Regions:
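Extended beta-strand/beta-hairpin segments
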Residues: 1-57, 69-179
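Conserved phosphate/anionic-ligand binding catalytic regions in large, soluble enzymes, centered on
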Residues: 66
């Protein structure tokens, strides 16, 4: 399998399985099992975060990890990081710094709390570093999403098996060791 250029890591493989009668989705990402849903107001059961929540989770986690990694490498006194994110749709005319001038566009507001005895210069550098997290850069770059139809039945059985299986004892021990 190819690696993601410049990272040495393999591309993520996520499988999402849903029932056509509702919004609740079962998600398998490596050894992790998640769910996604929509709020009751739009027809979901609000049993799990929604798709935009997961988008924000990815950006927030990557931002926090990147800032923490940089601060540790510099041995700066950063105690913890809190990243708060909000997604909204706005009119392009309400965004002076945006290239798009007509219609609607997506906005993600990010607030970063940096706790610790940091100098103003260190805080400014950490905010600069936050904008360089890989997920932030992906969202700001051109994205080519290739959609195709899988052969009938080729995904359904393997996904059911993965979603319904329980972690092995080895997987449980590995997860516990990471904690």
């Amino acid at each position: 399998m190819n690696t993601i250029e410049g990272t040495g890591t393999k591309p993520a493989n996520v499988v999402v399985r849903g029932n056509a009668s509702g919004f609740l989705q079962e998600i398998v990402s490596g050894a992790h099992q998640l769910r996604a849903d929509e709020p009751v107001a739009v027809g979901g059961s609000d049993a799990a975060p929604g798709p935009y929540d997961y988008l924000l989770v990815g950006l927030g986690a990557c931002t926090s990890m990147t800032v923490g990694l940089y601060a540790r490498a510099k041995k700066w006194p950063l105690e913890n990081i809190v990243v708060s994110l909000r997604h909204s749709r706005i009119h392009a005319t309400d965004c002076a710094e945006c290239e798009t001038k007509e219609g609607m566009l997506d906005r993600i507001d990010v607030e970063i709390g940096l706790n610790g005895a940091l100098t103003p210069e260190q805080r400014a550098k950490l905010i600069e570093v936050a904008a360089k997290c890989p997920v932030h850069r992906t969202l700001k770059s051109e994205i080519n999403i290739r959609l195709r139809t899988a052969p009938s039945g080729s995904l359904s059985e393997s996904v059911v098996t993965k979603v319904e299986s329980r972690p092995t004892e080895t997987a449980k021990r590995t997860a516990e060791e990471k904690i």
